[in-house]
């Protein structure tokens, strides 16, 4: 009788979280992880900070080596091994190694943690040297090597999402003339009102040229290297280095070919136990959908924290956890540093709330981060989204301090399905160095008849 084996496809956040949780659940289970690249167990979110020089070297992002998993946890790690085909009915995965050798691996249970891939539009000139995406460790390795060899002077970033904003700061830290080109009329598409305006002001105040409402159509070269970025209106921007940050897509090709159900978002459909539509096949991380607790809809939310937590659930259940582990879903909480600004959001934007069918409203409030008499306080701008019953639907904040942690209070309120008047009754911490007597959260949620 063949021994039970858990096979995990993908060796970064969700995949290794699944493998480790499976080991905690079943100490004697055979566990193997296959990873198509040469890198595992690293914090990709830190890549812009290595590019900027804040973090000294790429290796600082590596959390554990393959030997750690093999020797400390008896988890087999197979690098440079690409999954080619999943055969759920036969409990087999066909793989190919670097040497082009093909073989079949048996599984009792399978966890898919194939992640997401950076979108690189097939624009003219996208193959020129100096045009990059930044998603995986080897992307950072290539980009750093290019900077060291070519010594670029001017950088263009295509897209004003999270990676675009972080890379703007990284390139300015290196002294590059930096331009962000965004096809929509605002940065970070889900930010509304004055919150997004503050981000643009900060970028421009740091000598980043921000070009909104312009679509990039081509990259022009000098020889085999990028030299200019051209927009639909005919404008051209000098660039010796370009980062394309227009988003990512779920890496689901192998799952789709195996007949697994794919949702409207393009990601793998999973339930609260991280089970897919195929027996004994689980999925976790950026390749799968999850429940949005505010809208009640299945969404694709590719961020590290949900990926790890989904990995824990998938790994536990794939290893036979009793009772079954469950993933409670997301409310969509995240934060980004934009030079001196902290920018954070949770829940739905006004547009997302309206699309989800809510009769949604929004309002903004600005208040101090500390007591008025305490030195070095700054202004925090808060935008809250709610429905006509007063139910909180989302929040966005921007300021130079005290934002990234305060947003978690709103996230907790969303998890509890609270109304803004209930949130306004919270007993929050106060001391002059940390908050005014009435915290920005309480000011933003106060009844309209209060001063």
Give the positions of each predicted feature:
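A Rossmann-like FAD-binding core segment of flavoenzymes
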Residues: 28, 72, 77-98, 105, ...
